[in-house]
Amino acid sequence: MTKKMGLLVMAYGTPYKESDIEPYYTDIRHGKRPSEEELQDLKDRYEFIGGLSPLAGTTDDQADALVSALNKAYADVEFKLYLGLKHISPFIEDAVEQMHNDGITEAITVVLAPHYSSFSVGSYDKRADEEAAKYGIQLTHVKHYYEQPKFIEYWTNKVNETLAQIPEEEHKDTVLVVSAHSLPKGLIEKNNDPYPQELEHTALLIKEQSNIEHIAIGWQSEGNTGTPWLGPDVQDLTRDLYEKHQYKNFIYTPVGFVCEHLEVLYDNDYECKVVCDDIGANYYRPKMPNTHPLFIGAIIDEIKSIF
């Protein structure tokens, strides 16, 4: 008889419509309503990328691709998909409660973030665990997949494809900027999180397996908390690299993210490009993983390694 299990895919979430922006932002700020100025700034950013972020649709597509691939990988298990979001409905708790209502007693959880930190992946897992404990649901968590061969292969291919667009004689004047979402330094140090080291490892593997000669690690999209966050910021890094090495081409791979959304479409494609334009360098940013089979396969391989 086929065993029935849940697949809980967890993600940050994004507003579905403009009226969602205020409650969404309020949830991110732990219930503190944003000022009109902060709210307008966020609305302007969404407007700049063409309205709202494509994140919601892509997250749904990624979750569908994952459950489909997982059901092909396990002949003796039937996985049912549940989507749980951090800052907007359906919330993580709603998804776990629905599992219970459906009679699910065991599930695999995956966060759509390749690198582990207690602030990000750990907080999703904690919320899922707390809700699951109410119903006696057993959860097995995927903690990360930043070094999975297929994940690295995806990014290596993208770097090489981008390099192929650049004249060969300029490859020595090209730098790859590998980045992830910045997090508060104090939290990383307090919890002894492996987050910065995991990003460094991803960058090293891409450098080893691709044709890129120069590589740098940066952080992006930091919050406005008044406390130090991980750095250098990718914009500052771009200027520093240009001043020191006069690179002609900058390739940005925000490997800490898994699809096109506000942080990539605005923070990279607008803010980093503005810096490149200002210094007279060329800006490149390969396509994000989205539902690419190598990306989906990397997560499936990580699940196979723990379940």
Curated annotation (Swiss-Prot):
An example of a Pfam family matching this protein is Ferrochelatase
User: EC number(s) on record?
Assistant: 4.99.1.9
**What sort of enzyme, by top EC class, is this?**
lyase
For molecular function, the Gene Ontology terms on record are: ferrochelatase activity; metal ion binding
What reaction(s) does this enzyme catalyze? Fe-coproporphyrin III + 2 H(+) = coproporphyrin III + Fe(2+)
| Major site of localization recorded for this protein | cytoplasm
Q: Where in the cell is it found?
A: Cytoplasm
Phenotype upon knockout? Mutant accumulates coproporphyrin III.
Which N-terminal residues, if any, form the signal peptide? Answer: none
Among InterPro entries, the record links this protein to: Ferrochelatase, Ferrochelatase_AS, Ferrochelatase_C, Ferrochelatase_N
For the ligand (Fe-coproporphyrin III), the binding residues are 12, 29, 45-46, 53, 124
Pathway recorded for this protein: Porphyrin-containing compound metabolism; protoheme biosynthesis
Q: List keywords of the entry alphabetically.
A: Cytoplasm, Heme biosynthesis, Iron, Lyase, Metal-binding, Porphyrin biosynthesis
Q: List the PANTHER family hit by this protein, alphabetically.
A: FERROCHELATASE (PTHR11108), FERROCHELATASE, MITOCHONDRIAL (PTHR11108:SF1)
State the protein's purpose: Involved in coproporphyrin-dependent heme b biosynthesis. Catalyzes the insertion of ferrous iron into coproporphyrin III to form Fe-coproporphyrin III. It can also insert iron into protoporphyrin IX, but it has a much stronger preference for coproprophyrin III as the substrate.
Family listed: Belongs to the ferrochelatase family.
Identification of the protein by name: Coproporphyrin III ferrochelatase
What is the species listed in this Swiss-Prot or TrEMBL entry? Staphylococcus aureus (strain NCTC 8325 / PS 47)
